[in-house]
């Protein structure tokens, strides 16, 4: 389960933001997880509380925003990809040579005590 190491990395990034803004702790964070990022959102949510224990994010609420995969079909342009099809257009079956979105793994929002920072 690599989600525990991902949770630790998110906690490190959030800790940097806390220090940068002189805040002692965060009460919530939002993470964007792409469908093609190889991250299991449920496993990340399960790992986060234990990883955050003893850090400024202990007790913080983790929200996970799932980002669908979108690929570029040579014939149909941007199409939403279905994992079970692989990187193929759902309309014609052609390979989608470029993933436009869906591989994200990013800290999007961090709520500090009485202060909210967006688009980190």
UniProtKB/Swiss-Prot annotation:
Signal peptide extent: none
Entry annotated with the keyword Zinc: yes
GO annotation terms (biological process): protein maturation; protein modification process
Residue sites binding Zn(2+) per the record: 73, 76, 89, 92
Organism superkingdom: Bacteria
HAMAP family linked: HypA_HybF (MF_00213)
The protein's role, per its UniProt record: Involved in the maturation of [NiFe] hydrogenases. Required for nickel insertion into the metal center of the hydrogenase.
Record-given protein name: Hydrogenase maturation factor HypA
Species assigned in the record: Deinococcus radiodurans (strain ATCC 13939 / DSM 20539 / JCM 16871 / CCUG 27074 / LMG 4051 / NBRC 15346 / NCIMB 9279 / VKM B-1422 / R1)
Gene: hypA
């Amino acid at each position: 389960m690599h989600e525990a190491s991902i949770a630790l990395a998110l906690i490190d990034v959030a800790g940097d933001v806390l220090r940068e803004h002189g805040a002692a702790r965060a009460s919530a964070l939002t993470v964007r997880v792409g469908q093609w990022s190889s991250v299991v959102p449920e496993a990340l949510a399960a790992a986060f509380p234990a990883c955050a224990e003893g850090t400024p994010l202990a007790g913080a609420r983790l929200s996970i925003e799932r980002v669908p995969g979108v690929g570029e079909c040579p014939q149909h342009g941007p199409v939403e990809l279905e994992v079970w099809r692989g990187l193929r257009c759902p309309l014609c079956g052609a390979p989608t040579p470029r993933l436009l979105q869906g591989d994200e793994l990013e800290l999007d929002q961090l709520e500090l005590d009485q202060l909210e920072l967006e688009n980190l």
